[in-house]
């Protein structure tokens, strides 16, 4: 599927010293050619594949007000992007990690949905070899490592203003500070908590199995069915649909899974994004700390792996061959 670019603008923030971020603003929109289309397709692909947080504009959001004016035609897209870059510069300058970069604003359409994507991309140096095998320096946008990105689902925002998920953003590799400054720039607050939704789903599955009094194997088979559906949705880029999941699962007793989860008040949305790390708990146990890292299939608990809660002791019967080989070599060398 291709995306249709409506308007795209590029500006630049340059860090001159510890106190100064200089703006370089374009006087015209970027022309949409093959290179621009390829760049946006790659940025869309990279962004779509990453784990995102959800948010919504605050009532006093200047960016939201300016965007509304732009959408109504009261302000053109270039003017909107130039003013927004100024606000971004002012917010970014408050943080010591500010490095500047290429500021991108792109309005595009994908699968009948209109989006506005805003990103700060790093411009990096590299080497290239030409046809004469000469080496020269080249510059490129580091799209694969983009971590200052937000995207507004314009269709959702305008048709369902009460939504808590029309705005998405990346948390960033350097921790909370990146998302903090970007949320300040957007004047937005976090909305739908995807991890909480996924944790609620796991809790509902466990308690549904409890009510049906399933034995260990039946319970794990049921959890595996839930995981298979959710993982398929994750791999295809689709959300978990509670009604569809319920149809995939055999009813336990008189209630379907959806009826049970609604009656018990888990406050699950009708659909929500899958969280890979949380869903993995359906089929595996994992944890680390104090120099220990463990990861094993849930089916092994009570068969080859035993936990004594009284002494907080985990007993493993039958170690993996590669681990056993390391232990034997280390033991023999210490004698």
From Swiss-Prot:
Keywords in alphabetical order: Cytoplasm
Gene Ontology molecular function: any one: single-stranded RNA binding
Subcellular location per the Swiss-Prot or TrEMBL entry: Cytoplasm, Nucleoid
Ion transport in keyword set: no
Signal peptide, first to last residue: none
Keyword Repeat: no
GO terms for cellular component: bacterial nucleoid; cytoplasm
Transmembrane segments: none
Family: Belongs to the YejK family.
PANTHER family named among the record's database cross-references: NUCLEOID-ASSOCIATED PROTEIN YEJK (PTHR38772:SF1), PTHR38772
Protein name per the record: Nucleoid-associated protein PC1_1634
Species: Pectobacterium carotovorum subsp. carotovorum (strain PC1)
